[in-house]
């Protein structure tokens, strides 16, 4: 059961850096719905992409799976036999709840839930990889190496879904979308104190990139095609395609 997010409703004397701990995991479904515009749409459409790209006898990776929302969306939409989903997160609290969520919904496609560092996971025989608001929590210097590894592990015709919070090279546009996101959180019941305290905790651990920077990394990794397929304010999702025809 998810609880309402009130983690930052009272002043916190010492704000440390953000962690996906037990307290965050407990309120995460409410938190992300009220904080990330378009999140439900992205989750639903990841399932639609899975229906299009997942191939029989291949694997799907959900890297930074949190509570398993993207994993479940993929599994509901797989139309082939002998597929497997590997869901990975480094937060013990998230993984514990993810396993419970996955087990609560029965489906023929098996899911392996792994507690671990996504940088250490071997990607192989993949028809689809999902990075749903995950890359932004890696050090910028480590992001290219992960994308390189994903590209190598994808089969020809495979797809990477990369959802992120964006920064903008045009400062005026960036300010507008930042303020609209602020309005979105206020409209969802967050106070100025809650918004400010959460932002202070995230600013050192969530480092955002522009869409242009993401596309440049994807090209460098080898992806022949990439495009923004969803955006709401300063949040969105890209799809990157590996050339070739799925076997």
UniProtKB/Swiss-Prot annotation:
Gene Ontology molecular function terms on file: carboxyl- or carbamoyltransferase activity; S-adenosyl-L-methionine binding
UniProt keywords, alphabetically: S-adenosyl-L-methionine, Transferase
Source organism, top-level taxon: Bacteria
Signal peptide feature range: none
Keyword Transferase: yes
First-tier enzyme category under EC: transferase
S-S pairs: none
EC number: 2.1.3.-
Reaction(s) this enzyme catalyzes, per UniProt: prephenate + S-adenosyl-L-methionine = carboxy-S-adenosyl-L-methionine + 3-phenylpyruvate + H2O
InterPro entries in the cross-refs: CmoA (IPR005271), Methyltransf_25 (IPR041698), SAM-dependent_MTases_sf (IPR029063)
GO biological process: one example: tRNA wobble uridine modification
Sites where the protein binds S-adenosyl-L-methionine: 39, 64-66, 89-90, 117-118, 132, 199
Quaternary structure note: Homodimer.
Family, similarity comment: Belongs to the class I-like SAM-binding methyltransferase superfamily. Cx-SAM synthase family.
Function per UniProt: Catalyzes the conversion of S-adenosyl-L-methionine (SAM) to carboxy-S-adenosyl-L-methionine (Cx-SAM).
Protein name per UniProt: Carboxy-S-adenosyl-L-methionine synthase
Gene behind this protein: cmoA
């Amino acid at each position: 059961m998810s609880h309402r997010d009130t983690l930052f409703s009272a002043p916190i004397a010492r704000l440390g850096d953000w962690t996906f701990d037990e307290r965050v995991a407990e309120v995460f479904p409410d938190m992300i719905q009220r904080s990330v515009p378009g999140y439900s749409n992205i989750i639903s459409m990841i399932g639609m992409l899975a229906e299009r790209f997942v191939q029989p006898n291949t694997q799907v990776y959900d890297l930074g799976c949190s509570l398993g929302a993207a994993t479940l969306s993929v599994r509901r939409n797989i139309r082939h036999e002998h597929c497997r989903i590997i869901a990975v997160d480094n937060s013990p609290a998230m993984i514990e709840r993810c396993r419970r969520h996955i087990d609560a919904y029965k489906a023929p496609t098996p899911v392996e839930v792994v507690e671990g560092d996504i940088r250490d996971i071997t990607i192989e025989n993949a028809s689809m990889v999902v990075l749903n608001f995950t890359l932004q929590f890696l050090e910028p210097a480590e992001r290219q190496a992960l994308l390189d590894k994903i590209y190598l592990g994808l089969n020809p015709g495979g797809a990477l879904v990369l959802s992120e919070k964006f920064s903008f090279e045009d400062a005026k546009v960036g300010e507008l979308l930042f303020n609209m996101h602020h309005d979105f959180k206020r409209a969802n019941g967050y106070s100025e104190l809650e918004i400010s305290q959460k932002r202070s905790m995230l600013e050192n651990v969530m480092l955002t990139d522009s869409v242009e920077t993401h596309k440049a990394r994807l090209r460098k990794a080898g992806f022949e095609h990439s495009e923004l397929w969803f955006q709401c304010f300063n949040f969105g999702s890209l799809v990157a395609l590996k050339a070739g025809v799925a076997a």
